Regions:
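Bateman (tandem CBS) regulatory domains
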Residues: 115-119
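Glycine-rich, pocket-lining loop/helix-strand segments that form or immediately flank
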Residues: 108
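DNA polymerase processivity clamps
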Residues: 1-49, 53-105, 120-240
Length: 240
């Protein structure tokens, strides 16, 4: 269950990049007391960390998203524990009567820990479904090529806007929310934000901002965390 959840939580953030093939898969980063699954397409980065895995030591590998998707679909129907063994080129997943052998992506995965914001002091707590529904509604009026939306955050409220000047379209919604920090205006590609919010199962999300030019950190609220801890990093875009 944990492995399937980890794949499901990260696979949508993998890239289709012929130049950087290591980003076309999920990075399995094992430590002595935890396992972290990471995926990124350079616009968004998703980490899923669990302490339920029994790990023999520090190690890592990159599994291409295609076998990862197959593995997840099989694990969704099988609730047994999974044994993972690998070398420099191959990984073997064994569970129940099944053995799945996959070729690994060879190369160095980006240093993902360096891009995770540590001191974003402006914090928004908001109902995930409410934010998701609002972004979907507003994004209908966004430019179809860019999908840009803008969040204007002030104490106790969030304003979400989108516009398509070519078709004279605009949308605007104001939400009451729990926001503490300096006023922040930040732009995102709406489809990326929708993906992240859709793939979190929590009731409340926490978004942490430094300013409008640096990446936002998106995590479930602490009371919603269960077996795995998820964090998402979303790069901003310039908006007027």
């Amino acid at each position: 269950k944990v492995l399937a959840e980890g794949i499901s939580s990260t696979i949508y953030a993998t890239a289709d990049d012929e130049i950087r093939p290591t980003m076309n898969g999920i990075f399995f980063d094992m430590d002595t007391d935890s396992a972290t699954l990471v995926a990124t397409d350079s616009h968004k980065l998703i980490c899923y960390t669990t302490k339920e895995a029994k790990v023999s030591g520090k190690s890592s590998f990159i599994l291409h998203k295609k076998p990862a998707a197959v593995l997840k679909s099989v694990l969704d129907r099988d609730d047994t524990d999974v044994k993972v063994a690998f070398d420099s080129s191959t990984v073997v997943f064994t569970f129940g009567e099944t053995m799945m052998v996959c070729r690994l992506i060879v190369g160095k995965f980006p240093e993902y820990r360096r891009v995770i914001p540590q001191n974003n002091a402006n914090i928004l707590r908001i109902d995930r479904n409410q934010l998701l529904a609002t972004v979907r509604r507003v994004a209908v009026c966004a430019n179809k090529a860019s999908n840009h939306i803008k969040l204007d955050l002030r104490q106790g409220q969030a304003e979400i806007t989108a516009q398509d000047l070519g078709f004279a379209l605009a949308a605007y919604e104001k939400l009451e929310c729990d926001y503490n920090g300096d006023p922040v205006s930040i732009g995102f590609k709406s489809s990326f934000l929708i993906e992240i919010l859709s793939n979190m199962a929590c009731e409340t999300v926490v978004m942490k901002f430094a300013d409008g030019r640096r990446a936002a950190l998106i995590v479930p609220s602490e009371e919603d965390e269960e077996s795995g801890k998820i964090c998402a990093i979303l790069m901003p875009i310039m908006v007027s």
